[in-house]
Amino acid sequence: MAKLKITLKKSTNKAVKSQAATVKALGLGKIGTTVEQNDNPQIRGMIRKVSHLVCVEEI
């Protein structure tokens, strides 16, 4: 299964609460943190919701 490398690029301070919760659910905390997640529809939907805050690469 493919993996996605997700990096938090912008702060969640002024983001809507649901977007901040989505970033936390992805496993991201501070700006610059990176996580690897499996590529599935659930993760893709979460990324789409916060696409303006994160950077995504396929591994």
Swiss-Prot record:
Pfam families per record: Ribosomal_L30
Q: Which UniProt keywords apply?
A: Ribonucleoprotein, Ribosomal protein
What InterPro entries would the database entry show?
Answer: Ribo_uL30_ferredoxin-like_sf, Ribosomal_uL30_bac-type, Ribosomal_uL30_CS, Ribosomal_uL30_ferredoxin-like
Q: Entry's CDD domains? A: Ribosomal_L30
Gene Ontology cellular component annotations, sorted alphabetically: cytosolic large ribosomal subunit
What GO molecular-function term can you cite, just one? structural constituent of ribosome
GO biological process assignments = translation
Give the highest taxon in the source lineage.
Bacteria
PANTHER family on file? LARGE RIBOSOMAL SUBUNIT PROTEIN UL30M, MITOCHONDRIAL RIBOSOMAL PROTEIN L30
**Subunit comment for this entry?**
Part of the 50S ribosomal subunit.
Family to which the UniProt record says this protein belongs: Belongs to the universal ribosomal protein uL30 family.
Protein name, as recorded: Large ribosomal subunit protein uL30
Q: What is the lineage of its organism?
A: Bacteria, Bacillati, Bacillota, Clostridia, Eubacteriales
